[in-house]
C-alpha cells in the first residue's frame, strides 16, 4: 500500500518537471515575484547540486551576469571585492566535500554568503546565485544559499527542501547509496531473489524502494541500541537548521541575529541531552558522562556514511587515546579557555583583550555566555580564534592534525552539524559544555515562591490519554544522490526515483487535559513537561534529581475565565513540533497544477515556525513493552511584561516564534522552573501539578496478535541484522541468499 501511495503521489511527476521550466529565471525583473515563484527558483537551484544545472535559464543567467559590472547593485562593494579576490585566487574545487567547520572552507563560504546577502533586491540575489551555482563547490553553494534564505527578508515564506533530499549521502547508510547506484546502472534489472534479500522493490513507475533495515550492522558499543534516535534524519535536520538559524560566525548586527534570544541556544542543548537520557532510560541505560580528556575514549563510532567522492567517513575505534603529541597544543588551549570561562562565571566577569568587560552575573548574561561557549560573540582581534569552545573540542577529537584546513579534508561525523548527533561522543561534548552552563545557573539566585505562585489560580486535575509508541516506516527521496546522464539532463529529470525506506520512532496522537479554576479573568502561560519517575537503577527521583531531565513539551498562552477552565492540547499542535516535512516533489505538485499555474497563497505566519522545529513524532521516548513509568508536570504562571532583555527585538521574536507567546510574554526563560536548583520549601503551589503516566511500546509481536498475518511461509529472524524489532518475521526467500534464480531449490 505504501508503494502504491508513493506511485500515486508521483503520478504528475512528469508534468511537474515539464512545467517548472515555464518559470524562466532572468527573463523579467524578479523583484515583484510572488513567494511561490521565488520558492520554485530556489528549488531549481538546489536540484541535483553535484552536477551542473540542467536548466537552461539558470545556465544562461550564469553566463551573462558579470559581478564586476554590477557592483552598484550590492549594498557593500567591499564584500564583493573580497569575494572576487578570493575567487580569482582559487576556491574549494567542485566535486570536493564541503565541511562547514573547516576554517578554510568556512572562510570562503562566508564570503559567498555575504555577496548573496548584500544583493540589494531579490532579482540581484537570484542572478548572483545562478552565477555561483555554476562556478563554485556545490556543497558550499548549498550552505551559503540556505543561510541567505534563512536570513534575507525577501526570502521569508520560502520552504526549502529538506537537507536529506538535497544531499542524501550524510543521512543514510552507505549500503543504501550503493544499492541505489546498482539499480540505476542496471536499470533495475536484477535477480528477484537478490532484490528480495536486499529489500528492494521496483514498481512499473520506475520507483525503487530500498529497505534500510536489510543492511549489515556494525555494532561497536551499547550506544548503537539507540541509533534509531541519534541517526534520525529529522533530528539531525533539526541540529543543522539550528546552526543555520544561529551560525557561530554570524556576529554582525546587520544580520539581526543579535536581536534575538540567541543565547538560549544553550537551552536547546540541555533539552536535547534530556531527551537522550529519556531514550536511554527506555533501554534501562544510565546517563552519559562528561568527556574526560585524560582517559581513553571507550566509545567508538562507525558512521556507515560514504561521501560522494567515494571516501568513507573515518571510523573511531573503541578505547581511543584522545591527547597525543600531535594535538597537545589544542588541548592546552582548550584547558586555558575552559578555565577562563569557569573563572569568569565564579568572579562574575571576563576581561577581553581590548580591556572591555563581559559581565556574567545576571540571568540575562546567559546571552554572553552562550556566545562564548558556542561562538557568535563578535569578539575582537585574536579573541575569536580561541573563544569557540565547542570548535576546539571537535578539533581535539579529529583523526589527525595534518589535514586541517585542506581542500581534501575528509570530515568525521563530528565535523558536520548534519551528522554530529550520530556520534555518541558529541553528546558527551555537549554534556561538558552544559556543565559550564549549569555552573552559571548555579550562581544565580534560586526562584522564590513569588516566582512560582499564581494567586487565585488552582489546577484541579491533570490527565492524558494512553501514551503508546511504535516504530514505523518513512520513505526518504534519495534521487539527488544519483548522477544524471545526458539523456536525463535533456529531459530535466531522472528516469528512476530512488527511495530509502527507513525505520523511525513514532507515537499515537494523544491529548493532555488540564482543569484549572480561577477567581478572575486573566492571561496566563501554560507549560507542560515530561520526565522520569525512577532512575536507571529503579530509584525514585526527587524534583532536584530529575529537573535537568524534564522535557518541555508545550508552552502556550491561554486566557483563563472566571470559574472552571478546561484546557485541552493535542500532541500535534504542541509548541516546538511540526508535522512530517513533505517530499519536495509533492511540494511541486501542490505548487504547479496541470495547466502550469502557481498558487500565490502562503502562510507567512508559519514560515519560520515550520522550518526549525522537531517532528511531533519525537515527543515521547520509546518506552517499554510493559510500560515505562514517567511523570508529567504542568504549571500555570501569569504573563509578565517587565522582563524584556535590552538586546531583544520583539518583532523578530514574534515573527520567528522564538518562544511561545513572545508577542506579549517576555518571560521565556528556557526550562523554567527547572533551570535552577529548587528550594523545595517554596516550590509546591496550587498552580502546578505532577501526574504519573506510563509510556507503552507497541512492537511487531503485539501487532501480530491483532492482525491477520499468514505465517506459514515465514521464519523468525534472529541475527545481527535485526536490533529494533527483535522478533521480525521474514519470508523464506531470506534463506535463499546464495541462489542466482527465483527457483526455490533450497526447500526441503
From Swiss-Prot:
Entry's Gene Ontology molecular function annotations: nutrient reservoir activity
Xref: PROSITE patterns: HEMOCYANIN_1, HEMOCYANIN_2
Keyword Metal-binding found: no
Gene induction: Suppressed by juvenile hormone.
Tissue and organ expression note: Fat body, and hemolymph of larvae.
InterPro entries tied to this protein: Di-copper_centre_dom_sf, Hemocyanin/hexamerin, Hemocyanin/hexamerin_mid_dom, Hemocyanin_C, Hemocyanin_C_sf, Hemocyanin_N, Hemocyanin_N_sf, Ig_E-set
Keywords from the UniProt entry: Signal, Storage protein
Signal peptide: 1-17
Family label: Belongs to the hemocyanin family.
Name assigned to this protein: Basic juvenile hormone-suppressible protein 1
Protein's organism: Trichoplusia ni (Cabbage looper)
Amino acid at each position: 500500500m505504501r508503494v502504491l501511495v508513493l506511485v500515486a503521489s508521483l503520478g504528475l511527476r512528469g508534468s511537474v518537471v515539464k512545467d517548472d521550466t515555464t518559470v524562466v529565471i532572468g527573463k523579467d525583473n524578479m523583484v515583484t515575484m510572488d513567494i511561490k515563484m521565488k520558492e520554485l527558483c530556489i528549488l531549481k537551484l538546489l536540484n541535483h547540486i553535484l552536477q551542473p544545472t540542467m536548466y537552461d535559464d539558470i545556465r544562461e543567467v550564469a553566463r551573462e551576469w558579470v559581478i564586476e559590472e554590477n557592483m552598484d547593485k550590492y549594498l557593500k562593494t567591499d564584500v564583493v571585492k573580497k569575494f572576487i579576490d578570493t575567487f580569482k585566487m582559487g576556491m574549494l574545487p567542485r566535486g570536493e566535500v564541503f565541511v562547514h567547520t573547516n576554517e578554510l572552507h568556512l572562510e570562503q563560504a562566508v564570503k559567498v554568503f555575504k555577496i548573496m546577502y548584500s544583493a540589494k533586491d531579490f532579482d540581484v540575489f537570484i542572478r548572483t546565485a545562478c552565477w555561483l551555482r555554476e562556478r563554485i563547490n556545490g556543497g558550499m553553494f548549498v550552505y551559503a544559499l540556505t543561510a541567505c534564505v534563512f536570513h534575507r527578508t525577501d526570502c521569508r515564506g520560502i520552504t526549502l527542501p529538506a537537507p536529506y533530499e538535497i544531499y542524501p549521502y550524510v543521512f543514510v547508510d552507505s549500503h543504501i547509496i550503493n544499492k541505489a547506484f546498482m539499480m540505476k546502472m542496471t536499470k533495475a534489472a536484477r535477480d528477484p531473489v537478490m532484490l528480495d534479500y536486499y529489500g528492494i522493490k521496483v514498481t512499473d513507475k520506475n520507483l525503487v524502494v530500498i529497505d534500510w533495515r536489510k543492511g549489515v550492522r556494525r555494532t561497536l558499543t551499547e550506544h548503537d541500541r539507540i541509533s534509531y534516535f541519534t541517526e534520525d534524519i529529522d533530528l539531525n535536520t533539526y541540529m543543522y537548521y539550528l546552526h543555520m538559524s544561529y551560525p557561530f560566525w554570524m556576529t554582525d548586527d546587520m544580520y539581526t541575529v543579535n536581536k534575538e534570544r540567541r543565547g538560549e541556544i544553550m537551552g536547546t542543548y540541555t533539552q536535547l541531552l534530556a531527551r537522550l537520557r529519556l531514550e536511554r532510560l527506555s533501554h534501562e541505560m544510565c546517563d552519559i558522562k562528561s568527556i574526560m580528556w585524560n582517559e581513553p575514549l571507550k566509545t567508538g563510532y562507525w558512521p556507515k556514511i560514504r561521501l560522494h567522492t567515494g571516501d568513507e567517513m573515518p571510523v573511531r575505534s573503541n578505547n581511543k587515546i584522545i591527547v597525543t603529541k600531535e594535538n597537545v597544543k589544542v588541548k592546552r588551549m582548550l584547558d586555558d579557555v575552559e578555565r577562563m570561562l569557569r573563572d569568569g562565571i565564579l568572579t562574575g566577569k571576563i576581561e577581553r583583550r581590548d580591556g572591555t568587560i563581559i559581565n556574567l552575573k545576571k540571568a540575562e548574561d546567559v546571552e554572553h555566555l552562550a556566545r562564548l561557549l558556542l561562538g557568535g560573540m563578535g569578539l575582537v582581534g585574536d579573541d575569536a580564534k580561541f573563544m569557540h569552545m565547542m570548535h576546539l573540542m571537535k578539533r581535539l577529537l579529529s583523526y589527525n592534525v595534518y589535514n586541517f584546513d585542506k581542500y581534501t579534508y575528509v570530515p568525521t561525523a563530528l565535523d558536520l552539524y548534519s551528522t554530529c548527533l550520530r556520534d555518541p561522543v558529541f553528546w558527551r561534548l555537549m554534556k561538558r559544555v552544559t556543565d559550564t552552563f549549569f555552573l552559571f545557573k548555579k550562581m544565580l539566585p534560586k526562584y522564590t515562591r513569588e516566582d512560582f505562585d499564581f494567586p487565585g489560580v488552582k489546577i484541579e486535575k491533570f490527565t492524558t490519554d494512553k501514551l503508546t509508541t511504535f516504530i514505523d516506516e518513512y520513505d526518504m527521496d534519495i534521487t539527488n544522490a544519483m548522477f544524471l546522464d545526458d539523456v536525463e539532463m535533456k529531459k530535466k529529470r531522472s528516469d528512476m526515483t530512488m527511495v530509502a525506506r527507513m525505520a523511525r520512532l513514532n507515537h499515537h496522537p494523544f491529548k493532555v487535559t488540564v482543569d484549572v479554576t480561577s477567581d478572575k479573568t486573566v492571561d496566563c502561560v501554560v507549560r507542560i513537561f515530561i520526565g522520569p519517575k525512577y532512575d536507571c537503577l529503579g530509584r525514585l527521583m526527587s524534583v532536584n534529581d530529575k529537573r535537568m531531565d524534564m522535557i518541555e513539551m508545550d508552552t502556550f498562552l491561554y486566557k483563563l475565565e472566571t470559574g472552571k477552565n478546561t484546557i485541552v492540547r493535542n500532541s500535534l499542535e504542541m509548541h516546538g513540533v511540526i508535522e512530517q516535512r513533505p517530499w519536495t516533489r509533492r511540494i511541486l505538485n501542490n505548487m504547479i497544477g496541470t495547466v502550469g499555474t502557481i498558487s500565490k497563497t502562503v502562510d507567512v505566519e508559519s514560515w519560520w515556525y515550520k522550518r526549525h522545529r522537531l517532528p511531533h513524532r519525537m515527543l515521547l521516548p520509546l518506552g517499554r513493552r510493559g510500560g515505562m513509568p514517567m511523570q508529567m508536570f504542568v504549571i500555570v504562571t501569569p504573563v509578565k511584561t517587565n522582563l524584556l532583555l535590552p538586546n531583544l527585538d520583539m518583532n523578530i521574536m514574534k515573527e520567528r516564534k522564538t518562544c511561545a507567546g513572545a508577542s506579549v510574554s517576555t518571560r521565556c526563560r528556557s526550562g523554567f522552573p527547572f533551570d535552577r536548583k529548587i528550594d523545595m520549601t517554596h516550590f509546591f503551589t496550587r498552580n502546578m501539578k505532577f501526574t504519573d503516566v506510563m509510556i507503552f511500546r507497541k512492537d511487531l509481536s503485539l501487532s501480530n496478535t491483532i492482525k491477520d498475518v499468514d505465517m506459514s511461509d515465514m521464519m523468525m529472524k534472529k541475527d545481527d541484522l535485526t536490533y529494533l524489532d527483535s522478533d521480525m518475521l521474514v519470508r523464506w526467500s531470506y534463506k535463499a541468499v546464495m541462489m542466482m534464480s527465483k527457483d526455490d531449490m533450497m526447500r526441503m
